[in-house]
Amino acid sequence: QPAVAVAIIDSHVAMPALGVVDSGSLMGALGTSAVFLLLDKTARPLPKGIEGTAYSAAIPDAWCYEAGQASFGDLLAWFINAFPRSGNVKDDFAYYDRAAALRSLGAGHVLALDWWNGCRVPFGDSTLSGLLVGMNMRTTAVDIYRALMESICFGARTIVDLLASSGSPIERVVLTGGLAQKNDVLMQMLADILGCSLEIPRLTHPTAIGAAIHGAVAAGIVANYSDGAG
């Protein structure tokens, strides 16, 4: 008889492929937007602003706490499209990333709020908008780009701090998605702002691999998701 695994959310299905199967593991999927999933064996009060939690929704016998950012990579893409340098998007990203890497945190004295597409956490309001402050006649395009990078990293920090406020242990942070794999400057900035090391597995298709692991568990090829992850 063929075995059929139940349907599952795309971000959840990637977790075993990335080795995110244990309590205290936080996964972040970073693309145009961002989602963060934290596993915890213990049921805890949901911190105000965190979007939700469900039991055994991602990994059996574990609570999965979920929160996200409405804009992440698409905020940087907006800047590149609004203020192009060469007409080649890839080259423009490379230029601004290199230039931003040479600046220290807050060096341009420009601050950004990353709500270009509304705010998921902590307010859950799609009508809210982003902002830039601190600009003057000396402000450069790189200052603005760097501020936008900092803003999405601090948005992620807001989520991590809220999750930790419930008492949930966060022992490791595992990231996936195009930005995690391709933008080393942004990942270093995120590590600095979170104050922790980041694990970035070099998997090209973690969602597909995770789906295969789910199928293997359903078919009895492996005993559980931990074995599949190994």
Predicted feature locations:
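Active-site core segments that coordinate phosphate-bearing ligands/cofactors
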Residues: 1-230
